[in-house]
Regions:
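Conserved N-terminal beta1-alpha1 strand-loop-helix module at the mouth
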Residues: 1-43
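Hydrophobic faces of well-ordered beta-strands that scaffold small-molecule active sites
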Residues: 8-16, 41-43, 70-74, 99-101, ...
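Active-site mouth loops of central-metabolism enzymes
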Residues: 9-25, 70-82, 140-156
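Glycine-rich, proline-tolerant flexible connector loops at the mouths of alpha/beta enzymes
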Residues: 17, 38-58, 106-118, 170-186
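Short, acidic/polar
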Residues: 20-33, 55, 81-88, 153-163
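Alpha-helix-loop-beta-strand connector modules within alpha/beta enzyme cores
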Residues: 49-73, 118-141, 184-203
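Glycine-rich anion/phosphate-binding loops
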Residues: 76-93, 117-121
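Active-site/ligand-binding-proximal alpha/beta "capping" segment
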Residues: 129-173
Length: 204
């Protein structure tokens, strides 16, 4: 397990293209990234799953062509159970073992009046689905050194984060931050709360 090793590791995040014409340029960029031998390459997922097939194609190409571990993002907001199950099967078929399980950004035109009826309201719902699938995925989740914008306070945010880890998250990646002290304080608080999984700092 790469993140369990006590050595400095570097990873990259790749954004899938929105158009077919840009796919070759992304492949070229990933070829250059692979030469740096990163610990892994993370491949994001389009809002609402719009570029989800590109996510898998790019992740599989990096893994198969360069032998670099890949982390495929998977979001669940506005998704049906059938859609998520299909995506899980596609990820398994592609040989991808690492998944970043996210709720995803809520589309601006989405009806928010009946959220209680959504199949996947939070990332934890997707994490549970992945665990119940029977596949041996390594599941990652997001965390927020400055607290999630929808949380009332950081204590509540860390409580929900602990639930995510208990549900099956094996590592966490932070949202981008610009003050190292925010990260240090956050790490102290989550360790106090019993969250012991590796934390990847998201920087740009």
């Amino acid at each position: 397990h790469t993140l369990a090793q006590e050595t400095l590791s570097l990873s990259f995040e790749v954004f899938p293209p929105k158009q077919d014409s840009a796919f070759d340029s992304v492949k070229k960029a990933t070829e250059e990234i692979a030469k740096l031998r990163p610990a892994f390459v993370s491949v994001t997922y389009g809002a609402g799953g719009g570029t989800s097939q590109y996510t898998l194609d790019i992740a599989k190409n990096i893994k198969d062509s360069y032998g670099v571990s890949t982390l495929a993002h998977l979001t669940c907001v506005s998704s049906t159970k059938e859609t998520v199950h299909r995506k899980i099967e596609e990820i398994k078929a592609a040989g991808i073992e690492n998944i970043m399980a996210l709720r995803g950004d809520i589309p601006p035109d989405m009806d928010l009046s009946h959220q209680e009826k959504w199949t996947y309201r939070h990332a934890i719902d997707l994490i549970r689905e992945l665990k119940e699938s029977g596949a041996d995925f390594c599941i990652g989740g997001a965390c927020y050194p400055e607290k999630h914008p929808e949380s009332h306070n950081q204590k509540e945010d860390i409580h929900f984060l602990k639930e995510k880890v208990d549900a099956g998250c094996e590592f966490l990646t932070t949202q981008m931050f610009f003050d190292n002290n925010l990260l240090y304080n956050f790490l102290y608080k989550i360790r106090e709360a019993g969250i012991t999984v590796p934390v990847v700092a998201g920087i740009m």
